[in-house]
Amino acid sequence: MFQSQRLCGWIMNMNTDHETSDSGGSDEGDRRAELSTPAVGRLSLYYRELHRLLAAGESSTNSRDLGAMVNVSPAVVRRDLSSIGSIGRRGVGYDVAILAERIGAVLGSGVQWKAVLIGVGSLGNALLRYRGFERLGFSLAAAFDTDPAKYGHEVGGTTVRSLDDLEEVLATAKPELAILAVPSEQASQVATRVLAGGIQGILNFAPTTLRVPPGTAIINVDLASELQQLAFRIQNR
């Protein structure tokens, strides 16, 4: 959950950069600037659960039930939602459709993002098959690997290409984001290439901390380190 909150905060900040200069966009930008990264992460979780409620035909919910879905208290839910200008009605709660639309507007869910994935190993395969990206407005423009045996194969609807094609695809598809699922010894070189090709943000799953130019949007996700932190929390709860 902690990494997902960091990721959502990073995405929201990039969405703010994409905001238009009309008055409505300015209001949303002001609200985004006031939200903490943990609050943004929780809003994204509420958004996910609200869409599940909509799919199930539910029309209303309340802070107690919504909090139980994402493991936070009703008071935290009410505080988060009041911070984006959404106030529930006592005894009635929140209209699911209206609340989902409100949170989506704040998170910038209407912005469409294109990403490329480099490294189609076990983790890369799982990421390519994950359908949750599309719900939040992300599409995978291409996937790359250095193994010729994988070239031309389709994984989750995306065709795997040679890493030699990277610059060509970056120039034509113009994706904004890159997901790195490569070995640590390859990560720095790949990061340099994608940034030179116009990528604005990197989600790095390689077990190394990348050094990138100032102002570059990057999140380093080390799954082993996350497990260490989880073990620490269990030992010290």
From Swiss-Prot:
Its cellular-component GO annotations read: cytoplasm
Annotated DNA-binding residue span(s): 45-84
Identify the residues that bind NAD(+). Answer: G119, V120, G121, S122, L123, G124
**Molecular functions per Gene Ontology:** DNA binding; DNA-binding transcription factor activity
Gene Ontology biological process terms from the UniProt entry: negative regulation of DNA-templated transcription; response to redox state
The compartments listed are: Cytoplasm
The task this protein performs is described as: Modulates transcription in response to changes in cellular NADH/NAD(+) redox state.
HAMAP family per the record?
Rex
Q: Which family does it belong to?
A: Belongs to the transcriptional regulatory Rex family.
Give the quaternary structure. Answer: Homodimer.
The name under which this protein is listed is Redox-sensing transcriptional repressor Rex
